[in-house]
Amino acid sequence: MRTFRLLISMTLIFIVAQADDPRLKNASREDRNGWISIHLAGTPSEIGFQHGYLLAPEIDDVLRMYAYYINGSVKKDWSFFREAAERLFWPKLEKEYQDEILGIVEGLKARGYAYDNIDITALNGNIELVSYYLPYLANKIKADSMNNRAPGYCSAFIATGSYTEDGKIVIAHNNWSEYVVGQRWNVIADIVPVKGHRILMDCMPGFIHSGDDFAINDAGLLYTETTITQFKGFDETGLPEFMRARKAAQYGESIDDFIRIMKTGNNGAYANDWLVGDTKTNEIARVELGLKNTRVWRTTDGMYVGSNFASDEALIKEETTFDPKNSTSSPNARKLRWEQIVGRHKGKVNAELAKEFEGDHFDALAGKEQMNRCVICGHNDRDPIGTAEFSWPPFFPAGAVQGKMTTTSLAKEMKLWARMGHPCGEDFLAKPFFELHPEFAWQGKFLRDMKGQPWTMFEAKGK
């Protein structure tokens, strides 16, 4: 017992001593309503060190979860993705992002965790590697042998002009993902780099980008996205999407900047319909970014919605296996609901309605309230059919795991609203779920309760 107490005391002394590190002077962490709010400021290496130090236990948890979950899902161990990240991503990262990742590693080491830059790079690029690079390799060997791997992440909208209450931008997004992953998408990061613009975004522990993509900056740029269902394509010579998305948040000052940054070196991975706004002009855009095809819609008076459906006919035909005519698919069913919402709420859209939209349970196909794959606040764990287009079988534990929204007025003050857990506020409880669905018990090592939380305001504070 005395030895145990001595070890605990020594550990606490070590942590306190490290907390006196001058690199942590401008950093902070606060836990609120299921979220971890962090403030990071300084050079790339300082920002990375602060991130790694403040979120060390959570980064360790996320890395262990991913190694376990990915192996269980696609039968590839972490070493495969490390090798790919080291070869395809690390050499192409701009120096400031390499330095930030190396800083994260140093912060982790200061807390006693032995990960390296390749682990953190693979973590940041895991969606690109698991859902785009791996299918690309498999389909090169045997055509169409690994389709339907592009993740079905998210329901979102952006509106402006006569569609909103004040004529300015309203933007909102909920994250659809496997619950074992999404319940860890619980960081709000306020980043003040020495170069570029201040960023406020959600992310996972260890991410240098948002990942599900909801970000605003102090130049007036804001963006979100929904993934393109059943997209196929990857360019090994391209730049990692996670770096381009971070760069757009840090250096973008306009919609044109965003498009240029995202298109430069496009590797096709994490192909999305991006919803982008500029609070200086209240112009919005929908940027449908495939590998071969890109289409842009722009307006100062309209509402663009997303639920993982592509709109450009050439992109759908040439780069996906998506069926736009299948009304029972999750993307198309949610698209129908979005169309109803747009028609009924034109001229009224504001912050409170945005929160309601992201927690919406009305199944437009069935004409009633339900919890399933067809509603904006998705609950695949309640769906007896499942979401085949995302490779989610019946009752697979996945769906909407959190939501965010902001407006022109809020974004100009670097503020956003966020809700951890289902945006509708429903709890997901692991034990009763596994009792009903033991086929998913293998996820029990990391899948835990996901309690509903209130909408909470976050804002950039300090220098």
Predicted regions and their residues:
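Sec-dependent signal peptide recognition
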Residues: 2-9
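Hydrophobic h-region of N-terminal signal peptides that target proteins for export
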Residues: 10-18
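N-terminal mature-domain region immediately after signal-peptide cleavage
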Residues: 19-256, 263-268, 275-300, 327-463
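Active-site-adjacent segment of 2-oxoglutarate/Fe(II) JmjC oxygenases
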Residues: 300-329
